Each structure stands twice: as structure tokens, then as C-alpha cells.
Amino acid sequence: MSNKLTEICDTKRDHVARRKAETSFAELTARAKAADAPRGFRAALDRKVAEGGYGLIAEIKKASPSKGLIRPDFDPPAHARAYQAAGAACLSVLTDMPYFQGHDDYLVQARAACALPALRKDFIVDPWQVTEARALGADAILIIVAALDDGQMAEIEAAAIEHGMDALVEVHDADEFDRALRLRSRLIGVNNRDLRDFTIDFARTYELVGHAPAGCTFVAESGLGSKADLDAMADHGVGCFLVGESLMRQDDLAAATRRLLTGA
């Protein structure tokens, strides 16, 4: 695990401990059960691909630790509507506050503004957060293989399955990919960014996809900014993509998303 990822996860564990002290698990579970039914995150991606398009997970992201503020005029409901109008299959909403200036409310607001399934994009280090995500209305959660051991991953995935949610399992290399395949989820995100030096390398994704068993839905992440990038990935069997910063920096979010998906 990189030093930054270790720092973020340690901070997150402290945050979760405080949240647990504030809200009982029984109360949180009741809220999760009362939430709208999950919208089917992976199913929405697969449906777009089956229709001959690309399954885009369009990200709502205000800032990042490395880039600072990305979107000054930040408006999660408006961004969600723009993404939906332009043909995105799903949303990804950053909820981490200390490092990404996210907030739980952004997820609630974005999902309420559209009909798209939404991923809670956060650093999940405890199954408690999965129940919290469902209580917020999330349809999917992120499992970062680099941040967890096999037992932790299995517990978090089991919580997601219990709540009817999908788990996007993010990997960066072959070892993490092998560990991801021990889980039940076959929604695999391959991050093109090297955590050691933050360079982008599409070749790693091509190689991992080529060694995958049948039945996986692959999502390419990081460094994607044009339809040519998406087409290159598609030539290697990847039809789904998570794109955030390159879209969030555009003035006209809907037009930029359409251009990414269609080239026009």
C-alpha cells in the first residue's frame, strides 16, 4: 500500500470509529432497510454495452489531494442530470471529506436528481460503512484491493451482497487482480494509474483483461479523456469506464460527456 493510501485509510478508520459512537448499528440498519431499492449498478453497465454503447460511470468530484479544487461551481444535482442526459450509465460520487472535499449529502442529492445507479466513491475499511452507504441510497460501493486484506475484502463484500448492492473491486496489478478473483463480485475496476509514481499505463489494463475468466464486467479507470481512449480500451475487450476529472473540468458537462461517448 502506498504511503498516501495508508494515511487516508488510517484517517478513515478514525472517522468510522467516531461515526459508530454517534449512530447505533441498529439505527443505521433501519435506515438502510428504509432506503429506495438498489437500482442495479452492474446491470446498468452491462445493459449499455449490450445495446452497443459504452458503459460510462461518470464521476462527481469536487477536488483531489494531488490536484486541489477541480470544480469551483460544484452542483451535484445539476451534474447528475447533465451526465444522465448525455448518456452515462451510472454515477460515482466522492463522499470522502478530508482528502477530496466530498460529503455524504452530495451522494444523496445526486442520486435524487436522476434515475442512474450511484457508487459511493470512498475508502471502505469497515463493513459498517457499507450499511451507511445503503442508508444514504448508494447502489454500489468500492473495494480497493490495495487497502485491504482478503478477510476484510470478504467481509465488506458480504455486507454489500446482504444489502443488494454491487461491489466495484479496484485493482492496480496482477497480484491484486488474482486476489480480486477470490471474491464473488465480477465487477472489476482496473486502475491505469501506478500508485507508486502516478503514471498512466494502459498496457497493464490490456494485460489483466486478457487473462480474465469469462463473465467479468471490466471498468477501466484513470487517464481516460477522449473517445479515442475508450475505443483503444474497447479493442482489448473493455466496454465500461470510470471518468471523473477530465469531465469535471469542462464548462459544459453534458456536451463533454457526449463528446467522450460519441466523438461528436
Swiss-Prot record:
GO term, biological process aspect, one: L-tryptophan biosynthetic process
Q: Which InterPro entries match?
A: Aldolase_TIM (IPR013785), Indole-3-glycerol_P_synth (IPR045186), Indole-3-glycerol_P_synth_dom (IPR013798), Indole-3-GlycerolPSynthase_CS (IPR001468), RibuloseP-bd_barrel (IPR011060)
Look up the record and name the pathway of this protein: Amino-acid biosynthesis; L-tryptophan biosynthesis; L-tryptophan from chorismate: step 4/5
Keywords from UniProt, A to Z, are: Amino-acid biosynthesis, Aromatic amino acid biosynthesis, Decarboxylase, Lyase, Tryptophan biosynthesis
| Pfam families per UniProt | IGPS
Q: What is its EC number?
A: 4.1.1.48
* Molecular function, one GO term: indole-3-glycerol-phosphate synthase activity
Task: Please name the PROSITE patterns in this protein's record.
Answer: IGPS
The chemistry this enzyme catalyses reads: 1-(2-carboxyphenylamino)-1-deoxy-D-ribulose 5-phosphate + H(+) = (1S,2R)-1-C-(indol-3-yl)glycerol 3-phosphate + CO2 + H2O
Q: What class of enzyme is it?
A: lyase
Family matches, as CDD domains? IGPS (cd00331)
- This protein's source sits in the domain of life called Bacteria
| Recorded family membership | Belongs to the TrpC family.
Record NCBIfam families:
PRK00278.1-2, PRK00278.1-6, PRK00278.2-4
Q: What is this protein called?
A: Indole-3-glycerol phosphate synthase
The organism encoding this protein is Rhizorhabdus wittichii (strain DSM 6014 / CCUG 31198 / JCM 15750 / NBRC 105917 / EY 4224 / RW1) (Sphingomonas wittichii)
